[in-house]
């Protein structure tokens, strides 16, 4: 029954054609109006642009101060291994069923419509709130040059700019995001070269080698003293590492708009993961050997260049011109991330609407294939950035960081679970995995590995609130979990959905490999 490998028919204009062979009218804004005009390079840089941002350029400094250079490095490698399990699992599903929104659809089809509903809305909330976070960060970064300017000006300007950009045809959007992301990649590559030179003795510190791994030391204790404190320090920065990596899974979000997904999605996933993993681990490693973890500047609450470990490294080396350059790059980084935030959030809304978990008008598209109602709704949440005008910017930044980071781990856990159920469905329906365009390695063990540690990090991320009880810290750590549970329970009570049996799971609709 599932032996045919013929691809799903597509129109000459490249629009997504449903598996039943019908084609929707792009002008009417009906479901299926998204265009397959993205190339693999667009998908790669879309994910890179959404990933490399404030988490790496700002959050990594505080992470090194908390856990020490080696503790932070191990944390980034460890979370990177979890991300690998997530991305390979997502790649297998997205290559076989390349639909807009990807994993929220998979949750509804393979596990339970309730999970798809809760996962989709939480993930949308995550990216919509992150858009507000990046707008706030952009204003704070510009204040580095002129603190008298109100960030409200820049929130307004950038909100209007990125809302407009996301109404453009997707291939133009993809090209713009590619150039945005390229600036960040070049910056990190340049910093690595700079760090090698500084470590070798070019700067005023002289030859460093691994001195900072010895003094003040490779690990820092947090909350408690001794070995237990060092482990606590390591575990406490996993959320920061997760926030930094969050966005790499965007290659799955764009699967419904990419040309030739059977080849393009695996290529995009491969280059995206190894590119992001290599850049992140290298950056954290080199920061750890040229900046001492006890440098007080690492713990600054500022969101401009003064708090960036890249700038701190330059100051320690005696390079005075670099802070302005890094601040400009930071601005580019957060603006690029903001651009992809609106894209990813809007496509999740389209996926939710296709699964009847959101109003159907979210699927309306214009002649360019842009889901304009979904874009407008996601962009509107960015206006919450104005809340920063009445509170300390650092407090807002930290609160949003924790909320979005935990929501990201929840999404990763759900992706792993979706893949496990996807493999169960294939087995129950006698579809050999060897017939898929791409098969994830080390399965099912790798997906179980990712699921276990994602859940463990989610449950333990707020442990500090229990050691020295703090209601605000508890709420910050678990508000995403609470919201997720409320969405699950609410949808289940109102809709009375039943878990999907493996033999009944829909593994054909939207598949580019037509059934026979």
Positions of PLM-derived features:
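TM-loop-TM module centered on a large, flexible mid-protein loop between adjacent transmembrane helices
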Residues: 105-107, 112, 144, 218-225, ...
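C-terminal membrane-solvent junction of multi-pass transporters and transport-like membrane proteins
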Residues: 362-369, 412-477, 501-515
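Helix-loop-helix connectors at the membrane interface of multi-pass transporters/channels
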Residues: 104-109, 135-155, 252-262, 267-274, ...
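Extracellular loop-to-transmembrane helix junctions
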Residues: 45, 56-147, 151-154, 480
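Membrane-interface loop-to-helix entry segments
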Residues: 152-215, 246, 269-273, 401-414, ...
């Amino acid at each position: 029954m599932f032996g045919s490998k013929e691809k799903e028919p597509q129109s000459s204009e490249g629009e997504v054609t449903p598996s039943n062979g019908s084609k929707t009218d792009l002008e009417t804004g009906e479901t299926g109006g998204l265009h397959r005009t993205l190339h693999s390079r667009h998908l790669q840089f879309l994910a890179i642009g959404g990933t490399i941002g404030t988490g790496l350029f700002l959050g990594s400094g505080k992470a090194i101060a908390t856990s020490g250079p080696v503790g932070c490095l191990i944390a980034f490698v460890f979370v990177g291994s979890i991300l690998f399990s997530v991305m390979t699992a997502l790649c297998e599903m997205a290559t076989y069923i390349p639909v807009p929104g990807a994993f929220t659809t998979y949750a509804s089809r393979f596990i339970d419509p309730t999970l798809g509903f809760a996962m989709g809305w939480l993930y949308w909330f995550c990216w919509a709130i992150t858009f507000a976070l990046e707008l706030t960060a952009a204003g704070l970064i510009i204040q580095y040059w002129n603190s008298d300017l109100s960030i409200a000006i820049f929130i307004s300007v950038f909100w209007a700019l990125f809302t407009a950009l996301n109404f453009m045809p997707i291939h133009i959007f993809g090209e713009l995001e590619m150039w945005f992301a390229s600036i960040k990649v070049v910056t990190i590559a340049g910093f690595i070269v700079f760090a090698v030179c500084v470590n070798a003795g070019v700067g005023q510190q002289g030859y460093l080698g691994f001195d900072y791994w010895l003094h003040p030391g490779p690990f820092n204790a947090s909350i408690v003293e001794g070995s237990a404190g060092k482990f606590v320090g390591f575990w406490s920065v996993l959320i920061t590492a997760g926030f930094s990596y969050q966005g790499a899974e965007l290659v799955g979000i764009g699967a419904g708009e990419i040309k030739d997904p059977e080849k393009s999605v695996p290529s995009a996933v491969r280059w995206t993961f190894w590119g992001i993993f290599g850049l992140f681990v290298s950056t954290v490693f080199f920061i750890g050997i040229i900046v001492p973890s006890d440098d007080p500047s690492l713990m600054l609450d500022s969101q401009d260049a003064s708090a960036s470990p890249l700038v701190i490294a330059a100051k320690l080396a005696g390079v005075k011109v670099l802070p302005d350059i890094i601040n400009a790059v930071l601005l580019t980084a957060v603006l690029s991330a903001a651009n992809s935030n609106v894209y990813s959030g809007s496509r999740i809304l389209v996926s939710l609407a296709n699964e009847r978990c959101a109003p159907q008008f979210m699927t309306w598209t214009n002649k360019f294939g842009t889901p304009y109602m979904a874009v407008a709704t996601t962009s509107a949440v960015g206006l919450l950035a104005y809340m920063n005008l009445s509170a300390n910017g650092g407090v807002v930044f930290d609160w949003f960081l924790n909320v979005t980071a935990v929501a990201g781990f929840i999404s990763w856990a759900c992706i792993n679970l979706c893949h496990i159920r996807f493999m169960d469905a294939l087995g129950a329906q006698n579809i050999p995995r060897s017939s898929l365009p791409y098969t994830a390695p080390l399965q099912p063990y790798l997906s179980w590995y990712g699921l276990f540690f994602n859940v463990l990090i989610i449950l333990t991320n707020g442990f500090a609130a229990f050691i020295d009880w703090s209601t605000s810290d508890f709420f910050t750590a678990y508000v995403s979990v609470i919201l997720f549970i409320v969405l699950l329970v609410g949808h289940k009570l109102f809709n009375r959905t039943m878990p999907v049996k493996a033999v009944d799971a829909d593994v054909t609709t939207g598949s580019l490999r037509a059934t026979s």
